Every structure is written in C-alpha cells, then in structure tokens.
C-alpha cells in the first residue's frame, strides 16, 4: 500500500481517497462546528504526529502560510489520539487514522480539501502469484464498504 503517485517502478491500483480532518477534544468549543478553519490552528495547542515524511500536511500548511503552535510531538498515532481525547490539544490527521467509537474526539472536515490517494502496488513486469492476486482483489472489495472514505473503482 502506498500514496499515489508512486515510483515508475510500480503498477498501482488506486483504491481510496484519504482526506485530512481536524480532531478535537469532545468538550472543545468548536467540537460541534460543521468545519474546522485552518486559520484557527495558530490559536490552538497543537499535537503533531512526527512522521518521517508527511508531505501532505506540510504542503497544506505551507500553501496557506499557517504555523501552528506545536505543544506536543509524538510518533505514535495512539498517543496522539489519547492526548487529544485528554484535552491536551487538537490535531490534523488523515481520516484513515480515526476508528469510529474508539476515541472520544470530535472529527471535523477542514475548510479546505486536502486528501491523498491510496493504492496497491506491484512491481512493473512482475506477475503476482495467485494468492497475491486474491489478496489484492479482497482489498479492493473490502474498501468498497469503508463508509465515508471515497473508494475509487475502475
């Protein structure tokens, strides 16, 4: 699995779009808002997920010249969600990270659209084994039932 576009060494099959969303503590004043305005970020305590390469998030902030006040950094998705749940700040994450009902956080779409396309890749010129082909088909079928995530069908 990878974010598309990928290296030309791979043949990719897009399976879904993963949008960025704001996550806030349930008791946050904006928890019931219809969208989260990016312009609000510098006025919030921000919990940042330290990923080696989070191009989408950094590109989004750079594009809108927004510089959040990073209160906490973590490398753990679970720690980030727990910190937001505990009221230590807010965050911006990919929607695939959020499992409904697992954490008591409010999830809001951003006032600007930012998403990534996720796909399955196999090496170009490589014929996947039968079991790999069955797995790939299972993944495509499974993503059809993922609710709010937009599934790409070809």
What residues fall within each predicted segment?
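Flexible hinge/capping segments at coil-to-helix
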Residues: 9-20, 24-46
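A late-sequence structural motif
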Residues: 107-149
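Short beta-strand-centered segments that line the small-molecule binding cleft or hinge
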Residues: 1-20, 80, 84-88, 104-108
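Secondary-structure junction motif
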Residues: 44-64, 128-136, 146-152
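Generic preference for hydrophobic
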Residues: 12, 22-23, 46, 92, ...
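Hydrophobic hinge/microswitch elements
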Residues: 52-106
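Short gly/ser/thr-rich secondary-structure transition/capping motifs
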Residues: 2-6, 29-31, 101-103, 143
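Beta->alpha turn/N-cap motifs
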Residues: 1-6, 25-26, 76, 92-97
């Amino acid at each position: 699995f990878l974010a598309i576009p990928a290296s030309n060494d791979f043949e990719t099959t897009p399976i879904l779009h993963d949008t960025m969303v704001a996550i806030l503590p349930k008791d946050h004043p904006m928890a019931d808002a219809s969208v989260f305005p990016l312009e609000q970020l510098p006025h919030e305590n921000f919990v940042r997920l330290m990923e080696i390469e989070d191009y989408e998030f950094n590109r989004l902030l750079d594009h809108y010249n927004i510089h959040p006040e990073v209160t906490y950094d973590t490398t753990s998705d679970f720690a980030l969600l727990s910190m937001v749940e505990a009221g230590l700040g807010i965050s911006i994450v990919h929607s695939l990270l959020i499992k409904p009902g697992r954490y008591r956080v409010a999830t809001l779409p951003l006032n600007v659209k930012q998403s990534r396309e996720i796909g399955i890749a196999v090496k170009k010129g490589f014929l996947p084994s039968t079991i790999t082909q069955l797995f790939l088909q299972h993944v495509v079928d499974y993503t059809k039932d993922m609710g709010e995530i937009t599934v790409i069908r070809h």
